[in-house]
Amino acid sequence: RRIRDIREDNDLTQQQIAEILGTSQTMYARYERGANELPIRHLIRLAEYYRLSTDYLLGLTNEKKPYPSKKIKTR
């Protein structure tokens, strides 16, 4: 899975990322192996932390940049 490669490219341990996500290292390791589905809240947190698009994290695109945030118009 791509999340392992990104973590390793950033010289981070599974324990460090698990702490960022508020989960155990064991559970995070299961996400990396694909044994458990990565919850959406963790996907969003990883995208914010790494400043990458969720689609890139999921392997749906090779575009790393997050989508531009949309401005909410106020009346």
Where would I find each of the regions flagged by the language model?
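A short, Lys/Arg-rich alpha-helix, primarily the initiator
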Residues: 1-9
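Acidic active-site catalytic centers that drive phospho-/nucleotidyl reactions
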Residues: 7, 32, 55
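DNA major-groove recognition helix of helix-turn-helix
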Residues: 32, 50, 58-61
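Short, charged recognition helix plus adjacent turn
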Residues: 58-75
